[in-house]
Amino acid sequence: MDKYNEAIELIKNSKYLVVFTGAGISVDSGIPPFTGKGGLWTQYDPKFIEISYFYNHPLESWKEIRKIFYDFMLDSCKPNLSHKTIGDWSKQGIVKEVITQNIDNLRQAGGAKTVLEFHGTTKTLTCTSCGKKYDASKISLDKIPPKCSCGGILKPDFVFYGEGINPEVLRKSEQAILKADVILIIGTSGQVMPACQL
């Protein structure tokens, strides 16, 4: 049996299939990966999403964050066939959980039910002063940095360089991996820490 058919059989016969996705899955949706040839960090300086830089230079950070993640990624990118297939399998009960390193929300838009966003999401913003959460689609980014009703600066809810992974998401991801009898890995080299330790 060739590897393709062997993979099909493993998926068909799995009792607890977990899908683990990285940046490569969203390339067909028009989102370049962060690293490698044509990656975002060949076009933009990653310092703009370093947590210390963000706190010290929120306006400069938000200019790039808005351009990269909100003007482009969220406005024009739609789920591709891979996202939709995972969504269909999730609805059919084939895929039990999805762990994603992506922050683009395309697995959910494709229909996946249980998605653990390992590196967070662009869909929500949190006040750096009071902790209040906002739906990013309801916040105008015409004036940046966006601010909370308390006057605090809003930060996207994705993990910046220098920040830790949300402990609850890490715990649930580890549990999902332990429950899995098959893990389907799509679009990741498996080298990003700490996701590669799962």
Please place each PLM-identified region on the residue numbering.
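Conserved catalytic core of sirtuin-type NAD+-dependent deacylases
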Residues: M1-L198
